[in-house]
C-alpha cells in the first residue's frame, strides 16, 4: 500500500490562555501590600510550515486532530504564567489550504513559509494589572480566552517543472527512472503508477524537477481508470511532455489518437477546475523505439506531429537512446519559463489581519424586547469574565458601557428588563438590561463584590 497522500482534513485547536491570578501581597509589617496576582500565559498557536523534507500528508490523515499547548495560569508575587508552545505542523511545498467549503485560505510555496491557522487565546490579566485609582485592590482577575478551533483541508499540488502525461504503460515511469535517480515502481501492466513520482534531471547548467503522474485513459474525466484527481500535480508545471507508446498492440491505439485523447482529458480538467493548461509548452516523446516496429511507427507519425506544432523527440527508456537530447530540450523550456517568472519573494509569514475600520459591535433587535450584541470585543470580554464574582461582573458592565453598548441598546429601542445576548452565537450569555445603573460612579465595597449588583 502506498504511503503517498495528497489530501487531508485537519481539526485544529489552538491553546487556551491561562487564567489571571487573584492575590494580595502579604508580608510582615506591610499590611497594605496591594494586589500582586500575575497574568496568565498565552495559548500556543497552530502553524503550518513548509518543509522541504516533507513529501506527503499521510501523517495528518492518520492523526487529523491536533491541539496546541495551553498557557499556564498566573501566580502570586506578580509571576506571570508561561505561554503555551506553538504547534508547528510541517507540510510539503505546494500545499493549498482551504476551508471545508473549498474557499482558499493560502497557497504555501517556498521552504519556511508559515501560516498561522489557529490563534492561541490570550492570557487573562491578574488583579495586579487590573488595579486602578478607583479599584485599588481588585478581588477578581480575568479568565484566559479559549484558543481558536478550525477545520481545514490540505491539498498537495506537487512543485515540479515538467509534467509527464500519457496513457498507462506508455513508459513514463521508465523514462523518469532513466533520466534521474528516481526509482518508481515499473511493471508491464496498466496503472502500475498509483502516486506521482518526482525526479531531478540535470541538463548542462539547468537542473529541474520532473513529475510522473498516473496514466490517463479516455473517460478519465468521468471517473474511468484513476480519474483526473492526480492532474492537480501538473498544474504548477511550466512544461508538459506527452509520452506516447509506439509499441502498443491494443486495438484502436496509436500515438496520434493517444495524444488527442489525453488533450481532451486535459481540456475537461481545465474546464472543471478553472486551471487553463492549454498555454503550457508541450513536447512529445515517441517512446520505445528500441522495438523495430515502434521505430517505424515513430518515423511515420513524427512529421504529422511536427505539422501540428509539436517539438518531437524519439526516445527509448530501455536503451537510453535520445534521452540526452530530450533532457536538454526540456531544460531549454524550463530555463525560458524561469526567466519569464517574476523574481521570487523572500520566505514569508502569512497573516490574516482584520479589515480596517471594523465595526466594534452591532446591536441586532430580535423582537419582544430581546437584543443580540455581536462584535469581537464584547464577545471576548464576556469570555474573560468570571460570573461567579460580582466584582468581575461589575467590571464587565463598566467596559461594555464605555464601549457605547448602553447607548446603542437605547437607540435600538431596548427598555428596562430587556433580554440582551452577548457572546458566542451558539452559547451566548444572557443579561437582563437595567439602564438605570450608573457605571461611572466610584465603586467601593469588599473585594469580590459590586454594590450595583446587591
UniProtKB/Swiss-Prot annotation:
Keyword Cytoplasm among UniProt keywords: yes
EC numbers: 3.6.5.-
Domain Obg: from-to ranges: 2-159
Binding-site positions, Mg(2+): 173, 193
GO BP: ribosome biogenesis
Family the entry assigns: Belongs to the TRAFAC class OBG-HflX-like GTPase superfamily. OBG GTPase family.
Purpose: An essential GTPase which binds GTP, GDP and possibly (p)ppGpp with moderate affinity, with high nucleotide exchange rates and a fairly low GTP hydrolysis rate. Plays a role in control of the cell cycle, stress response, ribosome biogenesis and in those bacteria that undergo differentiation, in morphogenesis control.
UniProt-recorded name of the protein: GTPase Obg
Biological source species: Thermobifida fusca (strain YX)
